[in-house]
Amino acid sequence: MKKLQVLLISFIALVLILSGCSKHDKKHSRDHEPKELKVEFVPSQNSKTLNAKVKPLQQQLSKELGLPVKVHVATNYNAMVEALRSKKVDVAFISPVSYTIAHDKGVADVLLKSKGYLVDDKGNTTNKLVDYYRSQIVVRKDNHLHKLKDLKGAKVGLQDPESTSGYIYPMASLKKVNVNQSDIKIAQIKGHDQALIALLNGDVDAVATYQDARADLKQDYPKIYKDTKAIYRTDKIPNDTISVRGDMSKQWKTKISNAFLDISKSEKGKKILTDIYGHQGYEKAKDSDFDTVRKYRKLVEE
């Protein structure tokens, strides 16, 4: 009996020690201070084009923060979440869906969400700055597709499964009208511009893009609005985030946040950010801003 009591006391002591260590680790786990800031993007356009466009941002950030900055273009959103988890990336320009996945795993915290000019239902850019956007389903005008239910049996061009506007919101919208993943033929395409080109070439019947990705192709495809139509637009989606790895120190969160805010306020900086993602500015964000995204994720995952 005494041996059992001794073992029990020893076990309880061990649990208390480990618990104390865990609390100690947690207390000191948010103290990362980068010596070189690693920033990562996922392309919403041609990745080769984006690689060239991010270099000026690298220089601006380095100047603002006073340390070397290395910018990298990720292959997809899943790779970016993994890079945050493995602490290979400090700052991520990450979609709302990928942010919620990363945050729920404890590997990312949101700093800012982007602002952009509102695009109306005709594809015209207004002068109203908003912190949301929408996803849309686009088809060619010469086909028989007029509403979501018509997509049963169609070949649909979608983005990465963690893309907010290119996968999650359109798939959730389809499920709401009883069109399941098994009811469509999915063609995974990298880049919203490439999806629209595939549609114009007749490689797919419909594509999901952000509203209104067609505007980005008007110069190369002047008839894109004449030849295509949006048959559906989703509810509001919170804009893309600038997030940091989960163990970033509070001081550096503030520094990074202020650096991006300052860059976005200058004409030179605004042009750089517009060229990369169409961002017109930023505002501070909190995790609860993205609860609606979690609801759409859950609907797709069910």
Question: Could you say what each language-model-derived stretch is?
Answer:
Residues 82-150:
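Acidic, polar ligand-binding/catalytic clefts
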Residues 93-107, 175-176, 200-201, 205-225:
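A ligand-binding cleft/hinge motif common to bilobed small-molecule-binding domains
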Residues 108-130, 185, 218-236:
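Short beta-strand->loop
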Residues 34, 40-63, 74, 115, ...:
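Bilobed "Venus flytrap"/periplasmic-binding protein-like clamshell domains
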